[in-house]
């Protein structure tokens, strides 16, 4: 009898997989809004896909992947530039990451098209977006399995180009999220400073701003020390110097009287955070430079700095040398983990904030600046305490809280960003017989840093240019 009751109890959860599946999280997050939980579930799916991609780099996976018919037939003798001859055991991991990311990107791009112009949860397509999770996960798995049977060659080269464009787009989205976060942070602290205890909050604001600028200066100094030479690395010298000049310009611009007049909440906190992010993008670009003498690798730099600290005063620590890859093939390095950390923070923040109409409008800079963290506040009808799974509150009957299509497009670009990050932005040839770090990847990243700075400048000057719009 108990077993029968247990079966019926489990059966009550079936609608969560085939209908509005947000009830899967409602037991942990009671009275939560449907708009928030749906985004969290999609983000969790992408996180799972990222974990699967990371597993593909585990030593020994190539043995299993080579069992897939035709998946490794192309690899006879391969070579990673400036490293050593490799077998197909090495590149098969890159190909696996390409296929998994392809499945995720195709799924999210298809949903981006499907969810165009959804206005309320009454739209039948909204039910697909907010539910039917079992079928959507099954679809992703099906596309993943099928993608491993796609012939290589031109697919690999074309997908690399698409991945590079999509990853660059996600870098810009990260900047938009960063600007939004910095503005919200600054506004919150300024409001508290005006409400009471101004000296304390002013000191906190000044301390954090100073910390970001100090870290940026240290970052730039390390880049000059390890990524340039007195008689070489001209491109790196230009990248660092030019971006430093631009960061100084935006910092001065953010406190210009004209800017302050039209946008009083702009300030150095936002500029300091953007400066630090720009230094990160500069380093990320130079870490893909093909010339290994100008790109020593993060592990080599850390080793050199550690040996310099621990070495006796009368000895000199050896200069950093280009890192030698593991004999077993490609693996996740320090650069990968830093890129993944930035990705996780960006996606987590966007899942609860960026995707509202007011926040997605920041992608077009339309000026609305409401906060949607209140979506998680408890209100609406109380859940029945009858043992049935809790249901999320549908807060989108009168209008969606975020742009469904834009959210899926962001996840699509995030999938491509993960693909490029895990594969170190290496470029395959037409037959996937070589993986090389090339200059196009460097220029895509460094150009993204310039576009990011340009976007931030636009957020500052937009109130001066578009005087008929409300940016308050």
UniProtKB/Swiss-Prot annotation:
Q: Name one GO molecular function term.
A: phospholipid scramblase activity
Q: What is this protein called?
A: Serine incorporator 3
Spans through the membrane: 96-116, 132-152, 159-179, 203-223, 239-259, 329-349, 406-426, 446-466
Its membrane topology, per UniProt? Answer: Multi-pass membrane protein
The record's catalysed reaction(s) read: a 1,2-diacyl-sn-glycero-3-phospho-L-serine(in) = a 1,2-diacyl-sn-glycero-3-phospho-L-serine(out); a 1,2-diacyl-sn-glycero-3-phosphocholine(in) = a 1,2-diacyl-sn-glycero-3-phosphocholine(out); a 1,2-diacyl-sn-glycero-3-phosphoethanolamine(in) = a 1,2-diacyl-sn-glycero-3-phosphoethanolamine(out)
Q: What's the name of its gene?
A: SERINC3
Instruction: Please report the PTM annotation for this entry.
Output: N-glycosylated.
Q: Which GO terms describe its cellular component?
A: Golgi membrane; membrane; plasma membrane
| The organism of origin for this protein | Bos taurus (Bovine)
> Where found, per UniProt?
Cell membrane; Golgi apparatus membrane
The lineage, from the top, is:
Eukaryota, Metazoa, Chordata, Craniata, Vertebrata
């Amino acid at each position: 009898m108990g077993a029968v009751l247990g079966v019926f109890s489990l059966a009550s959860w079936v609608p969560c997989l085939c209908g509005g599946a947000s009830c899967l999280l409602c037991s942990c997050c009671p009275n939560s809004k449907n708009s928030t939980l749906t985004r969290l579930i999609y983000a969790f799916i992408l996180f799972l896909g990222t974990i699967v991609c990371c597993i593909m780099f585990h030593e020994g996976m190539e043995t299993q992947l080579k069992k897939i018919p035709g998946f490794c037939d192309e690899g006879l003798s391969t070579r990673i530039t400036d490293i050593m001859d490799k077998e197909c055991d090495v590149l098969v991991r890159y190909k696996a990451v390409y296929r998994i990311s392809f499945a995720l990107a195709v799924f999210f791009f298809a949903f981006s098209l499907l969810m165009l112009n959804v206005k309320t949860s009454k739209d039948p397509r909204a039910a697909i977006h907010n539910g039917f999770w079992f079928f959507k996960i099954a679809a992703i798995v099906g596309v993943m399995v099928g993608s491993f049977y796609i012939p290589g060659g031109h697919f690999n080269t074309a997908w690399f180009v698409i991945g590079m464009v999509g990853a660059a787009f996600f870098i810009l989205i990260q900047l938009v999220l960063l600007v939004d976060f910095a503005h919200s942070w600054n506004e919150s602290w300024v409001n508290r400073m005006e409400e009471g205890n101004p000296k304390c909050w002013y000191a906190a604001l000044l301390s954090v701003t100073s910390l970001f600028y100090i870290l940026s200066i240290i970052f730039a100094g390390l880049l000059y020390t390890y990524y340039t030479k007195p008689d070489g690395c001209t491109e790196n010298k230009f990248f660092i110097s030019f971006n430093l000049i631009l960061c100084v310009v935006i910092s001065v611009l953010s406190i210009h009287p004209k800017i302050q007049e039209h946008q009083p909440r702009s300030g150095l906190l936002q500029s300091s955070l953007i400066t630090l992010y720009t230094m990160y993008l500069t380093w990320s670009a130079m870490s893909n430079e093909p010339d290994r003498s100008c790109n020593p690798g993060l592990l080599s730099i850390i080793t050199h700095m550690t040996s310099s600290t621990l070495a006796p005063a009368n000895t000199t620590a050896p200069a950093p040398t280009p890192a030698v890859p593991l004999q077993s093939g490609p693996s996740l390095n320090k650069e990968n983990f830093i890129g993944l950390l930035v990705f996780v923070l960006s996606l987590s923040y966007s899942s609860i904030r960026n995707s509202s109409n007011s926040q997605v409008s920041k992608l077009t800079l339309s000026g609305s600046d409401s906060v949607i963290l209140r979506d998680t506040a408890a209100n609406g009808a109380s859940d029945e305490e009858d043992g049935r799974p809790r249901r999320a509150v549908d807060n989108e009957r009168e209008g969606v809280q975020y742009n469904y299509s834009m959210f899926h497009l962001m996840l699509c670009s995030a999938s491509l960003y993960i693909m490029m990050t895990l594969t170190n932005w290496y470029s395959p040839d037409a037959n996937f017989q070589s993986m090389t770090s090339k200059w196009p990847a460097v220029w895509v990243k460094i150009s993204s840093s310039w576009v990011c700075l340009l976007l931030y400048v636009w957020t500052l000057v937009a109130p001066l240019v578009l005087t008929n719009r409300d940016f308050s």
